[in-house]
Amino acid sequence: MNVITCRHYEELSEKAASIIAETVKQKPDAVLGLATGGTPEGVYKELVRMHRSEGLSFRNVTTINLDEYAGLSPEDKNSYHYYMNTHFFAHIDSRKDRHFLPDGRADDLDAECGRYDRLIQTLGGADIQLLGIGHNGHIGFNEPGTPFESRTHVVELNEETRQANARYFPSIDQVPVKALTMGIGTILSGKRILIMASGKSKAQAVKQLLDGRISEAFPASALHAHPDVTVLIDEKAAGGD
């Protein structure tokens, strides 16, 4: 693992964006594996700035997202479809038909997971996969105990994860109880992985990730089996004040 420590969140976001931008410049038809949540927001903001100010084009890029809530329509403001459109897709020159996310409204969620995983395999996996990390080491919605060889699947969201995401919803009761997520094996099929952590609240998870012990009890530890992982953290996530 290559660990890069940045001074603060803004620098962290700029560094992550520069790595993704370099991937696109080297391979204009790159497959970008994307994540949602608070941590990547600054990355998308910087990529949009680079598109507008520096001419970075996403015209030939394909995107695949990690996950989506079950039961939410793409127009729902809490769906990850809506998040991606709001923070990124609506502001760049990419093609709408090249953005792929799991369909949380599918009649058969298990079949949808199989379809999505086959799509990712057909695309050859992500050229670069962006990840965040949960306090318990979850990546995507892969909670502790998820097999490392898992493929895209339906997951029951545990109480800790629902509480962590409750700030985006009017109440905890409205947080979905299920989601569709790339499995750990699917994530590991990416050619390069970029995992980000920001803030003191993520310091313990970062410490556990970097101590090198591999266990399904800490999903992010699976990344030690991947040959090209960059860990981007700010000073607070590194354990500093």
Curated annotation (Swiss-Prot):
Disulfide bonds: none annotated. Belongs to the glucosamine/galactosamine-6-phosphate isomerase family. NagB subfamily. Its EC number is 3.5.99.6. Pathway: Amino-sugar metabolism; N-acetylneuraminate degradation; D-fructose 6-phosphate from N-acetylneuraminate: step 5/5. Catalyzes the reversible isomerization-deamination of glucosamine 6-phosphate (GlcN6P) to form fructose 6-phosphate (Fru6P) and ammonium ion. It is an enzyme of class 3 (hydrolase). SUPFAM superfamilies: NagB/RpiA/CoA transferase-like. The active site is at 67 (proton acceptor), 136 (for ring-opening step), 138 (proton acceptor), 143 (for ring-opening step). It comes from Bacillus velezensis (strain DSM 23117 / BGSC 10A6 / LMG 26770 / FZB42) (Bacillus amyloliquefaciens subsp. plantarum). One of its GO terms (biological process) is glucosamine catabolic process. The keyword Kinase does not apply. Keywords: Carbohydrate metabolism, Hydrolase. The keyword Cell division does not apply. GO terms for molecular function: glucosamine-6-phosphate deaminase activity; identical protein binding. GO terms for cellular component: cytoplasm. This is Glucosamine-6-phosphate deaminase. NCBIfam families: nagB. It catalyses: alpha-D-glucosamine 6-phosphate + H2O = beta-D-fructose 6-phosphate + NH4(+). HAMAP family: GlcN6P_deamin.
